[in-house]
Amino acid sequence: MYRANRKARVRECIEIHHDAVAAEKARLKAKGKAFTNLEIGFTKRRVLRDKKNPKVINLPLEFATILKGCEEFIDNPSRFPALDIWVSEMRNRQARELVAKVLACLLSNTDMISGRVGKPTEAGMKTLSYYQLQEDYALRFGEYIAPKSFGKAIKYLKQAGYFHSEAINIRMEDGEGAVRSAPAYKQFSERFFSDLKVVRYSNVAESIVATRKRQMKEGLRHTWVSFREIANGVRQIFLNANKFESIAESTGRVFEAYLPLHPNPH
């Protein structure tokens, strides 16, 4: 039943995707505007998960270049050298397309300065589960992806040294020592951003910094949400966040070397 419910949520996201695209076409037609390509996929567009009012919105400008880089990998294996060198499956175009699409979903939910995958909130960066990211895949591409296929793409990214994750285990206060888990910390590496090459383009770097400043003005924080917040008051949490804080600092230095940043107090 649990798996069936998850699959049903993904199917709903696929429907929302198609409804949102249809609504956007109707909106443009009513304004007399031409539309030649309303794909979401590797563009800076995003579909909001709103069944009652399906809608297409725009992500910040930097995502146009970043997600285009993901699409380029499909026909150009050397676009991401570490994947090309260390993951033999990348010789297959279908495998590259899988990785490119999963990358697009991860990156559209990533703070581009720290490399943290999640959602910035006033309490901090909220972790996202792989199931949530699979639903985002359905919203972005309008198609179903099997959890096993999504997991393969993640494995390839880790094998290339591009992506890291750390489980969050929570000991419950049930007297039996039961352990539950929360969505893992997920993090892109400095190597990934070096291969992505976003800092080579001043307009992209400037847009990334502008996005961070705008979010900070809105009161959003980009450090991981506190352990207590994740555990929601349970007694003990077993995790290793220090490693990911150092990775985030290292990733941030890539941007600092290119475009001076003021330290983020959040």
Question: Where are the regions that the model predicts?
Answer:
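Winged helix-turn-helix DNA-binding recognition segment
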Residues: 113-173
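Short low-polarity hydrophobic stretches
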Residues: 106, 133, 137, 186-188
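Short recognition helix of helix-turn-helix/winged-helix DNA-binding domains
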Residues: 1-132, 241-265
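Electrostatic interaction modules used in gene-expression and signaling proteins
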Residues: 1-19, 143, 147, 151, ...
